């Protein structure tokens, strides 16, 4: 006997979260809970404003229609990426095919005063990998901050993300301030320039490895080995079903590329599932999931060690 529930939710964000020049005051999304006999599976559907093509309202309509079809015996997945991902997670939990083991290690997202960051990063146990957003300020400033961190902590490796913010000139201005002796400790720089060709040229000219992120979701993207390209960053909420995520990870690994499972600012429930997906598909790579602290609460499932208050399922709005 099948049953289902869909929950709508909204989490207040910390002040100062800006996506594509838009301040994000709340994170809005949906959960689907599927039940069959004694078994239960959950999934999160939370399109990311400015990045997802679909809106939260679009996703809700598609999800509710899919749930009705599933209750009637139809299991075909929807095409909309955020819905396909959430639904496939719920089905995988229901079928017990999403392993419970999780990788809760995070590459901490660094912002704020560089002196404070140095103290925090120097105390990190184990492999020191951190993420820095660049492209929000002047490229010269970004270069100086990155150089300072790499200089101060000799065993630190940085993942940088420019979100296609730079022209070729700005990319060169950034690189000019990063000591060539430290550049190999930049694990990769995600999408430095506005076009893929300019990003490839940046990698060739600077020796700084790059990673594809937004490019993976463009219709003309193909997985090929290229000089200077070291990694792909896979955001399942923007990608689609678990099968599609797994296909992309396998395609990257076949080329010797690092595949990084990354957050689209999901709630704690979605983040814990991403941690399980990372442990399953990319066990040797620290995922990019350090976004929970941007929110003011957790929901339904806790992220281990987080002090944020937990909102129970009973407090969420039911849609069925």
Curated annotation (Swiss-Prot):
GO process annotations (BP): menaquinone biosynthetic process
Keywords: Lyase, Magnesium, Menaquinone biosynthesis, Metal-binding
SUPFAM superfamilies per record: Enolase C-terminal domain-like, Enolase N-terminal domain-like
Cofactor(s) named in the record: a divalent metal cation
EC number of the protein: 4.2.1.113
Pfam families associated with the record: MenC_N, MR_MLE_C
Pathway(s) served: Quinol/quinone metabolism; 1,4-dihydroxy-2-naphthoate biosynthesis; 1,4-dihydroxy-2-naphthoate from chorismate: step 4/7; Quinol/quinone metabolism; menaquinone biosynthesis
Binding residues annotated for Mg(2+), in chain numbering: 161, 190, 213
Disulfide bonds, paired cysteine numbers: none
Reaction(s) catalysed by this chain's protein: (1R,6R)-6-hydroxy-2-succinyl-cyclohexa-2,4-diene-1-carboxylate = 2-succinylbenzoate + H2O
UniProt enzyme class: lyase
GO molecular function: magnesium ion binding; O-succinylbenzoate synthase activity
SMART domains: MR_MLE (SM00922)
Entry annotation: catalytic residues: 133 (proton donor), 235 (proton acceptor)
Function recorded in the entry: Converts 2-succinyl-6-hydroxy-2,4-cyclohexadiene-1-carboxylate (SHCHC) to 2-succinylbenzoate (OSB).
Family membership noted in the UniProt record: Belongs to the mandelate racemase/muconate lactonizing enzyme family. MenC type 1 subfamily.
NCBIfam families: menC_gam_Gplu, PRK05105.1
Name of the featured protein: o-succinylbenzoate synthase
Species the sequence originates in: Escherichia coli O81 (strain ED1a)
């Amino acid at each position: 006997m099948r049953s289902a529930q869909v929950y709508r939710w909204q989490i207040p964000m910390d002040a100062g979260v800006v996506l594509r020049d838009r301040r994000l005051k709340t994170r809005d999304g949906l959960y689907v809970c599927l039940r069959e006999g004694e078994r239960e599976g959950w999934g999160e559907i939370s399109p990311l404003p400015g990045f997802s093509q679909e809106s939260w309202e679009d996703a809700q309509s598609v999800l509710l229609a899919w749930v009705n079809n599933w209750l009637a015996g139809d299991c075909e997945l929807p095409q909309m990426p955020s819905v396909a991902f959430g639904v496939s997670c719920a089905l995988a939990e229901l079928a017990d095919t999403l392993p419970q083991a999780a990788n809760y290690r995070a590459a901490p997202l660094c912002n704020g005063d560089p002196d404070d960051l140095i103290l925090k990063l120097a105390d990190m146990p184990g492999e020191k990998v951190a993420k820095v957003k660049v492209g929000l300020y002047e490229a010269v400033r970004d270069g100086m901050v990155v150089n300072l961190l790499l200089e101060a902590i000799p065993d630190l490796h940085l993942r940088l993300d420019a979100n296609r913010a730079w022209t070729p000139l700005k990319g060169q201005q950034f690189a000019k301030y990063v000591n060539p002796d430290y550049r190999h400790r930049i694990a990769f720089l995600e999408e430095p320039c506005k076009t893929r060709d300019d990003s490839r040229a940046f990698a060739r000219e600077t020796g700084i490895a790059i990673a594809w992120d937004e490019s993976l979701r463009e219709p003309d993207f193909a997985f090929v080995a290229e000089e200077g390209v070291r990694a792909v960053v896979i955001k399942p909420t923007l990608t689609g079903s678990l099968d599609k995520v797994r296909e992309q990870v396998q395609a990257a690994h076949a080329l010797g590329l690092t595949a990084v499972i990354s957050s689209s600012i999901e709630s704690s429930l979605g983040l814990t599932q991403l941690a399980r997906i990372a442990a399953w598909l990319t066990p040797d790579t620290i995922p990019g999931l350090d976004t929970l602290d941007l929110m003011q609460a957790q929901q339904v499932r806790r992220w281990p060690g987080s002090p944020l208050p937990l909102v129970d399922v009973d407090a969420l709005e039911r849609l069925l």
